[in-house]
Amino acid sequence: MKHLSSLVVLLLVGGVWSAGADPKGDRKLVAKGSKVYAKNCVQCHGPGGDGKGFESMLQKLGARDFTQGVFKYRSTPPGELPTDEDLYRTIMEGVPRTPMPHHALLKKKEGRAVAQYVKTFFPAWKAEGEAQPVPLVPRPKNAGTPASLERGREVYRFLQCASCHGGTGRGDGPRAATLPPDTLGNAQYPTDLTLEKFKSGPEVEDLYRALMTGLDGTSMSAYGQIFTPPGDTGLQERDIWNLIFHVLRLKREGGFSAASP
């Protein structure tokens, strides 16, 4: 097994030199990342980064195919590649309620190295460069107040969030059973907003990012333009925070006392 692991590392590193697909020219960092990848990632994502590792074949939820250049968890606009920091955050923190574990035992340099190596699987990364994150609208002082929560409930209803997530946020809306597979071919299930952990991350800023940029490759749309004036929806920038705190109330109260018909 040790010899097999060493062979995988050699193949991966060799692939970097032959392909010449180092987005930043830091071959030492990419080479280091390839070793981290071979030890921690290849089992699911595969030697070629296509999500066809042997463990992925045994899982209900397929691993991310890096060769497609489609990433759910980003701070960048829809359709754009994630930033280095986005990749690093996902690698280190993992994705709750999925087979993607956290890698808290990795050193920071190892996490950043494997993030650079992941980028070599999608050549367009070198040409397109790094997109700019969507600006974070400051949280209003009244966010989470009774008036804010009521407004958030109205926004939830206006945007028809209940069609997928359900009025109580339990992921049982009328469209839930009819969503098509995502771009990886995985079945889609709307997030149960009452569960303890969101896949996008534990902070309110993570929820903000998911709502504003969407989850590429899935039916979860981006709402950034809707909340960005000028527009004719009647929504304002601060309404994204009203919606977020309504979602957090659904989570906190299990959806029962904050139903959004």
Annotate each predicted stretch with a short phrase.
Residues 28, 34-61, 97, 124-128, ...:
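Periplasmic/extracellular electron-transfer cofactor-ligation site
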Residues 57, 73-82, 86-115, 191-192, ...:
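Axial heme c-ligation environment in periplasmic c-type cytochrome domains
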Residues 74, 108-117, 121, 141-153, ...:
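Contiguous, function-dense segments enriched for cysteine-driven chemistry
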Residues 2-9:
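Sec-dependent signal peptide recognition
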Residues 10-19:
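Hydrophobic h-region of N-terminal signal peptides that target proteins for export
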Residues 58-64, 68-70, 113, 133, ...:
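Primarily the internal scaffold of c-type cytochrome electron-transfer domains
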Residues 18-36, 125-157, 197, 235, ...:
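Electrostatic cytochrome c docking/interface patches
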Residues 31-35, 39-42, 64, 85, ...:
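Solvent-exposed, polar/charged alpha-helical surfaces in well-ordered, non-transmembrane soluble domains
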